[in-house]
Amino acid sequence: MMWWALWCAVVVAAGSGVAAAPAPDSLSPLDMVQMDSSAPDDETLYAMSPMAARYSAGAPWLYLLADMPRDSQTGSGRVKRRMPSLSIDQPMSVLRQKLSQEMERKQQAFRAAVNRNFLNDIGKRGFQWTPSVQAVRYI
């Protein structure tokens, strides 16, 4: 934990030393009075953003940003994929539904077989007229 505090102190000290000394090849400072006109002329009215009403004429960066084309302001670093996110919820619910339908079909077939056997044992279906079949049946 101590190294982190030491690192922060070194970065702050180095930053203050760099900011105090002007660079030899630096640009000349901007004349803010020239850019800060209280009444913009008709040519720049189209370039004023809707935020210009909120900020007074003391914000010349609004004019500079409004003059830039819109596509240059957006970063084209990463292209977002347009596919929907992958999820297993829908396929799993479909599989669960198919499994429950298959189990219900098997239970229905089993119940139909039990009913068929029950109906074969009672009434006319269960009575055999030939004695040889009855003898084989009960032996």
Swiss-Prot record:
One of its GO terms (molecular function) is hormone activity. One of its GO terms (cellular component) is extracellular region. One of its GO terms (biological process) is neuropeptide signaling pathway. It holds the Pfam family CRF. Its main location: secreted. Keywords: Amidation, Cleavage on pair of basic residues, Hormone, Neuropeptide, Secreted, Signal. It is found in: Secreted. Residues 21-79 form a propeptide. The modification Isoleucine amide is found at I122. Residues 1-20 form the signal peptide. Belongs to the sauvagine/corticotropin-releasing factor/urotensin I family. This is Diuretic hormone 41. It comes from Agrotis ipsilon.
